[in-house]
UniProtKB/Swiss-Prot annotation:
Organism per entry: Dechloromonas aromatica (strain RCB)
Phylogenetic classification of the source organism: Bacteria, Pseudomonadati, Pseudomonadota, Betaproteobacteria, Rhodocyclales
Enzyme class: transferase
Keyword hit for Membrane: no
Cleaved signal peptide residues: none
Protein name per Swiss-Prot or TrEMBL: Dephospho-CoA kinase
Annotated Pfam families: CoaE
Reaction catalysed by this enzyme: 3'-dephospho-CoA + ATP = ADP + CoA + H(+)
Gene name of the record: coaE
UniProt GO molecular function: ATP binding; dephospho-CoA kinase activity
Function, as annotated: Catalyzes the phosphorylation of the 3'-hydroxyl group of dephosphocoenzyme A to form coenzyme A.
Domain of life: Bacteria
CDD domains (alphabetical): DPCK
Residues at which ATP binds: G13, S14, G15, K16, S17, T18
E.C. designation(s): 2.7.1.24
Amino acid sequence: MSCFVVGLTGGIGSGKSTVADLFVEQGAGLVDTDAIAHELTAAGGAAMPALIAEFGALVATADGAMDRAVMRRQVFADPSARVRLEGILHPLIRQLSAERCRAAASPYVILAVPLLVESGTYRERCDRIVVVDCPESLQIERVMARNGMSADEVKAIMAAQATRQQRLAAANDVVVNDADQAKLYAQVSALHLQYLKLSAEKVKASC
């Protein structure tokens, strides 16, 4: 694994992708578990044969990708479906993310994991954890605008995730993303310099 791994997480609508992109602009590597999940469930993705075998051909679209609407209905209708889905996807995501962290040539890697706080496996991989934070009212507003969901739908998703307090308690560092872009950039730039220093210290200590 790359010498220094920074786990990045935050609640839905917190702006994780925006912050991850800012770190990449500064020179960090990025391993995004959501992107890996999409890759695995795209047409020809490594998870598709197992998903079709487990859930039937209806979970695939005509081009062979996972039909997210169909899978979402199955998961809501049958509590065991989520466990079975995660049993197929999660080992593959863990394997690929570990391989990509190891292969990264950057001074440090941002490992973006939406449910990092809920997952002991990913937390153990990280040298630091940075949480993207904003008021819960702003999370709801952003997701409603982005995804066309109702406030109740967004609140239901938030209720299934770690609480804001739990995420902040797990954080080594916090990036506040409350719509002030200049402040956001300044926070990421300062953390980037800190992570470069910590990465160099770790390399030196391991020599």
